Amino acid sequence: MRDTKTHGTASSRVTRLVVSVHDVASATAGQTRRWCADADSLGIPVSLLVIPGPWRGAALADEPGYAEVLRARAARGDELVLHGWTHRAGPEGSPPRRLLGRLVARGAAEFAALDEAQAADRLARGRAVLAELGLSVRGFTPPGWLASAATDRALARAGFHYTTSHFGVLDLRSGRMRRGFALSHRPGGTGERLGAATMERWARWNAGRGGLIRVALHPDDLARPGLRDATLRAIEAVLAAGGRAVTYSDVVPDTAGSR
């Protein structure tokens, strides 16, 4: 298993860096492989956010060979995280809530307006598929980082350890929030270049300040010129300042309150 990596000089306030690879599915195997290769070249672990249901093609259960790839990544020290079921928003919720999902998550806000029973059903289906393929998860990241309060209750009842939002990582057992804004791109959207520059500046500014920095990698980022390079510069800046690369499970310890 790969150790987490720290660069630069030691500090009493070490910044922790979580790099997450989103939208992991057989349909995005090539993009995931490329992001993982970048992480491997830096010697850092990643949190792989897996979509088990049908999305952009076959469901994970129909591609058991790809599950072997994920098992190999986990054996290297990466973490697998449940990332919704189908990654598509339904008709649930009020018009303002659905509009928010379209604007923020581009129609992927699957859990933004679910009630507890609906959320529990999708969580159970997703985890059952992963378990059948020999894959285990402790945490959940909702598509678009948008989830209803009922989803959080369903997660806690199902025994998940943590969930994430745009603003941090929530320990579902203690209720404690580890603050850390998720830095990500919006490929093809308004302000794409400004957003890329902001990611790099934010990472550099906060690299030596302690706390938590989160960098989110998406498959569609790789189709846009400059986004990959900006992302890698942001990650390298945190590592050069002494940041420690970890997975989400490292942020939320087994014993609540021990960190």
Task: Label the predicted regions.
Residues 2, 11, 46-50, 212, ...:
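C-terminal domain-boundary segment and adjacent tail
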Residues 23-31, 52-66, 88, 141-150, ...:
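Acidic-and-aromatic substrate-binding clefts and catalytic sites of carbohydrate-active enzymes
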